[in-house]
Amino acid sequence: MAAEQYYGTGRRKTSTARVFLTLGGGKITVNGKTLDEYFGREVARMIVRQPIELTDNVEKFDINVTVKGGGSFGQAGAIRHGLTRALMAYDEAMRPTLRAAGYVTRDAREVERKKVGLRKARKKPQFSKR
């Protein structure tokens, strides 16, 4: 196995990502597939790449990711969060740059629960005055 490996856990909505960084040529593997195979939409791929592009480490690391739960954008956000944490484990000096971009903070927004008597979380049944 790799001599030097850095790890970060990322979460977003119901998705959890485990990100492993090893020094290499810039390969990104998500659940055994390449990034382009795993994420069909270009926007999701851009979200994943944001931290390494910001810190100019695109060709420096091989990234191996295991991600579970949620949808594609939730998973992309979880990978970005985990990748940010792994980069900070590699070099703590990157923290201010990543913090300024807003990648360090976990996005705590979750789906609001459906309430009894309502159609959705906040949508009410139609009101009839008479």
UniProtKB/Swiss-Prot annotation:
Q: Name one GO biological process term.
A: translation
Provide the family line.
Belongs to the universal ribosomal protein uS9 family.
| Keyword field | Ribonucleoprotein, Ribosomal protein
Q: Which Gene3D superfamilies match?
A: 3.30.230.10
Q: Does the keyword Ribosomal protein apply?
A: yes
List the Pfam families hit by this protein, alphabetically: Ribosomal_S9 (PF00380)
| MF-aspect GO terms | RNA binding; structural constituent of ribosome
Superkingdom of this entry's organism?
Bacteria
Q: Does the keyword Iron-sulfur apply?
A: no
PROSITE patterns, per the entry? RIBOSOMAL_S9
Q: Name one GO cellular component term.
A: cytosolic small ribosomal subunit
The protein's name:
Small ribosomal subunit protein uS9
InterPro entries hit by this protein: Ribosomal_Su5_D2-typ_SF (IPR020568), Ribosomal_uS9 (IPR000754), Ribosomal_uS9_bac/plastid (IPR023035), Ribosomal_uS9_CS (IPR020574), Ribsml_uS5_D2-typ_fold_subgr (IPR014721)
